[in-house]
């Protein structure tokens, strides 16, 4: 799977480590991917963080069918990026998809690694 990456022109300032907290700070970027019956999951991309447009007729607004999995990545002392248990995250999100009757995602461990390398 190819992931198109569009980097934010002016990245935000990183918070101090003693100020971190869940839901308090957000990354400068977000991962998006489209789904259609004919193409399955496609058009994977990382874009600058921002509003997500959707139709008022979107099922998620009417029936609440959605899944979430919070993959974590940490900066290593050597400057590299370490993903925290990506295979387990993929298994959990696919299990959630199955429970919600949402098509499962393709195994995404390789694309996560590719994105972290960039």
Q: Which residues does each predicted region cover?
A:
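Conserved alpha/beta cores of soluble small-molecule-handling proteins
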Residues: 1-118
């Amino acid at each position: 799977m190819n992931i198109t990456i569009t980097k934010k022109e002016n990245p935000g300032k990183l918070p101090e480590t003693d100020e971190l907290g869940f839901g308090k700070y957000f990354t400068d970027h977000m991962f998006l991917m489209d789904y259609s019956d004919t193409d399955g999951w496609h058009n994977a991309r990382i874009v600058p963080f921002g509003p997500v447009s959707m139709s008022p007729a979107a099922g998620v607004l009417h029936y609440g069918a959605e899944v979430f999995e919070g993959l974590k990545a940490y900066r290593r002392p050597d400057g590299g990026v370490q993903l925290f248990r990506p295979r387990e995250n993929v298994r959990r999100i696919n299990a959630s998809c199955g429970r919600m009757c949402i098509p499962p995602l393709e195994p995404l461990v390789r694309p996560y690694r590719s994105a972290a390398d960039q």
